[in-house]
Swiss-Prot record:
Any single biological process term in GO: polysaccharide transport
Listed name of the protein: Capsule polysaccharide export inner-membrane protein KpsE
Gene behind this protein: kpsE
Transmembrane region(s): 28-48, 357-377
Keywords of this entry: Capsule biogenesis/degradation, Cell inner membrane, Cell membrane, Membrane, Polysaccharide transport, Sugar transport, Transmembrane, Transmembrane helix, Transport
Domain of life of the source: Bacteria
Length: 382
């Protein structure tokens, strides 16, 4: 066996040594240019399948932008909203994601559609292709580009038939619209849920403070200690005024009557009775015991302040909810289709003149390089 291998190697060496550089240069054009060009032409004529492209242009805008008409003017002026640009890039990533591929495969039977590529082995998708290979094949069949000047997202889809290319693009638009709606509504729901949670907390605090106020009124058998204390103070002031007037009248009586005169005695008794009433009313207002009006008024004021504060807080949360609803509705994002996908009339791929020109250019460059290299080798031999 070893002897046979050595014989074969010796034969190959003999054949290679017999081939001169002149022979190689003589057939170099056939090897480098004609043979590859023939292979390309055979592939294009026999194996390649025509592929059709459908194209659409979309923009992501907020609902208030649409209402104000800023969509048309913004696009005409070449301006793009930073928020819309960010959303467009998010959408671009989603379109190229496995989630979008799964949705397309479910609706279009994507794997089955691209497995029927005829004899085109370069664009064939195996039914047993791995998930990674399937995703790579999908990305080769869709092109999503973002124009930062106009804020437009350009979506190009290809298929082996015009109908599939169109349906492919339409389904991408439908799933993109669902993604944008879900993303903006989810943000709005989160904001509204937070506002409603804060409102519920404020309502519970308000109910608790109201219950505390009612319990205080029931336990102390009083409606408003502050009002009662103010009424008692007003009454004491009135009685004090009456007492001062009666004392003045008594001094007037003493100018012409004796101390034991009936009018004087009666006036003194009236003043003493009035003073006793004043003392009694004052004892209701201020006293060291905790059930007096002054202490009750302080406690009541604290509880009442809690109720008023929690009431205002509850009103603020209600206002916040309404503002959140309005703001969420204003910031809802929509997918605006600027250019709808159309049914292609001509195949876009393969671009035969372009492929032939590029292939010929590459072959000629390679031919020139090898030709120069062989010439250098020939000079060194000489």
């Amino acid at each position: 066996m070893l002897i046979k291998v050595k014989s074969a190697v010796s034969w190959m060496r003999a054949r290679l040594s017999a081939i001169s550089l002149a022979d190689i240069q003589k057939h170099l054009a056939k090897i480098i240019i004609l043979a590859p060009m023939a292979m390309l032409l055979i592939y294009l004529a026999i194996f390649s399948q025509p592929r059709y492209m459908s194209e659409s242009k979309v923009a992501i805008k907020r609902s208030d932008d649409l209402n104000s008409g800023s969509l048309n003017f913004g696009l005409l002026l070449g301006a793009s909203n930073p928020s819309s640009a960010e959303d467009a890039l998010y959408l671009k990533e989603y379109i190229n994601s496995p989630d979008m591929l799964a949705a397309l495969d479910k609706q279009l039977n994507f794997r089955e559609a691209f497995s029927h590529s005829g004899l085109d082995f370069l664009n064939h998708l195996s039914k047993d292709e791995t998930a990674e290979g399937f995703l790579k094949y999908y990305k080769d069949r869709i092109n999503v580009s973002y124009d930062d000047k106009t804020g437009l997202l350009n979506i190009q889809t290809t298929g082996f038939s015009p109908e599939f290319a169109l349906k492919f693009n339409q389904t991408v638009l439908k799933e993109s619209e669902r993604f944008i709606n879900e993303m903006s509504h989810r943000i709005a729901r989160d904001q509204l849920a937070f506002a409603e949670t804060e409102m519920e907390k404020a309502r519970q605090r308000l109910d608790a403070s109201k219950a505390e106020l009612l319990s205080y009124q029931d336990n102390n058998n009083v409606l408003d200690p502050q009002a009662q204390a103010q009424a008692a103070s007003t009454l004491v002031n009135t009685l004090m005024g009456q007492k001062i007037q009666m004392e003045a009248d008594l001094r007037n009586l003493l100018t012409y009557l004796r101390e034991d005169a009936p009018q004087v005695v009666s006036a003194r008794n009236a003043i003493q009775s009035l003073q006793a009433q004043i003392d009694e009313e004052q004892s209701k207002i201020t006293a060291p015991q905790g059930d007096k009006l002054n202490r009750m008024a302080v406690d009541f004021e604290e509880i009442k302040s809690k109720v008023e504060f929690n009431t205002e807080l509850y009103k603020l949360t209600l206002t916040s909810i309404e503002k959140t609803r309005v703001e969420a509705a204003r910031k809802l994002k929509v997918l605006s289709v600027i250019s709808s996908p159309q049914l292609p009339q001509e195949s876009s791929f393969p671009n035969i003149p372009y492929l032939i020109a590029c292939w010929l250019l590459v072959c000629c460059l390679l031919f020139g390089t090898l030709k120069l290299l062989l010439a250098v080798i020939e000079d060194h031999r000489d």
